[in-house]
């Protein structure tokens, strides 16, 4: 990543560098713009070529399932903060194997690469999903409600949460369960 650590970005890079995985998705663009306005140097990853996102200095084509790729990105960026948005998020996605490989193995690859840094990020936000609760008919859900995923996407996100906890002693993890409705 040629732009990192040189020119006018040097001071900014030394202070706050955020890596947003899945920057090309719904939330990535909004978050990138907001963080750039707050003074963060934003670098994103996407499995797709050609993404242009406001606020992002660079977007790197990266498949989180490829440990060498994500390790290279993490080693170059040395993020102070990470927002992990990358996932197969369509509950009707037909390739079930891809759901599990991306949402669990890809997430583990990211956490492993981050844990291997000499200076680990101040915070790593892992996005799970309210789908871990399943088809609850309650109007208001609590984090203490029963976890009962009703599809492969929900199961993969719950498994990702449990896997992420194995890194809790090495990384400052935050796990969020957002709703999209």
Predicted regions and their residues:
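N-terminal Rossmann NAD(P)H-binding glycine-rich loop of SDR-like oxidoreductase domains
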Residues: 18-36
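SDR active-site strand-loop-helix element
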Residues: 21, 45, 82-86, 124-129, ...
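NAD(P)H-binding glycine-rich loop region in Rossmannoid oxidoreductase-like domains
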Residues: 64-102
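Conserved Rossmann-fold NAD(P)-dependent oxidoreductase catalytic core, especially the SDR/UDP-sugar
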Residues: 108-152
């Amino acid at each position: 990543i040629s732009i990192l650590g040189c020119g006018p970005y040097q001071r900014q890079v030394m202070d706050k560098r955020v890596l947003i995985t899945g920057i090309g998705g719904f939330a990535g663009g909004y978050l990138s713009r907001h963080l750039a306005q707050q003074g963060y140097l934003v670098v994103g990853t996407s499995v797709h070529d050609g993404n242009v996102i406001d606020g992002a200095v660079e977007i790197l084509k990266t498949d989180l399932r490829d440990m060498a790729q994500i390790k290279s990105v993490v080693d170059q960026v040395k993020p102070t903060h990470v927002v992990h948005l990358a996932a197969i998020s369509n509950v009707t996605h037909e390739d079930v194997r891809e759901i599990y490989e991306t949402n669990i193995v890809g997430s583990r690859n990211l956490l492993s690469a981050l844990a291997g840094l000499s200076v680990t990020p101040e915070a790593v936000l892992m996005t799970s999903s309210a789908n871990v609760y399943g088809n609850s008919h309650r109007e208001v859900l609590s984090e203490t409600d029963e976890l009962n995923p009703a599809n492969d996407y929900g199961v993969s996100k719950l498994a990702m949460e449990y896997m992420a906890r194995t890194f809790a002693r090495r990384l400052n993890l935050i796990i969020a369960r957002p709703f999209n409705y």
